[in-house]
């Protein structure tokens, strides 16, 4: 459902005195597997009616010590906007980092900016960057 159509529907429901929250929260169909230029794999398993996002992420960037391991992600969607976070730690491995991505879907692509926090040489470090994903 387009954002314009969702907005019109929400206003129509409001005029009738009906709840419009679900109509406003509609997001494009993004569930599935997405891959970026570093072959990292984002799997969006579900987008709830409230906009909550669940899935997994496997970072395959060169030199990453936890490459290929899928970690859970949590996040939110609102229309075409998305934000999600991965804590790179599970029962088997601790990569000592957290990454958050924020961006939007446009023309079948997902463009995001990311921020990662980790310790480098014993000092807290923050790095930023951007990625573009296509559906696999």
Predicted segments, located by residue:
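Bacterial N-terminal signal peptides
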Residues: 8-17
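Sec/Tat signal peptide C-region and signal peptidase I cleavage site
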Residues: 18-25
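Central antiparallel beta-sheet cores of small beta-barrel/beta-sandwich binding domains
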Residues: 26-101, 105-106, 114, 121-136
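Bacterial N-terminal signal peptides that target proteins for export
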Residues: 1-8
């Amino acid at each position: 459902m387009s954002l314009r159509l969702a907005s019109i529907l929400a206003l129509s429901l409001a005029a009738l005195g009906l709840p419009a929250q679900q109509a406003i929260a509609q997001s494009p169909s993004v569930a599935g597997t997405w891959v970026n230029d570093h072959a990292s794999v984002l799997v969006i398993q579900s987008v709830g009616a409230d906009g909550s996002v669940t899935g997994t992420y496997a970072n395959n960037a060169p030199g990453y010590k936890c490459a290929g391991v899928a970690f859970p992600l949590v996040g939110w969607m609102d229309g075409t906007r998305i934000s999600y976070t991965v804590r790179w730690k599970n029962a088997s491995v601790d990569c000592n980092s957290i990454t958050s991505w924020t961006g939007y879907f446009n023309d079948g692509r997902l463009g995001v900016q990311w921020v990662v926090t980790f310790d480098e040489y014993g000092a807290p470090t923050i790095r930023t960057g951007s990625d573009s994903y296509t559906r696999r």
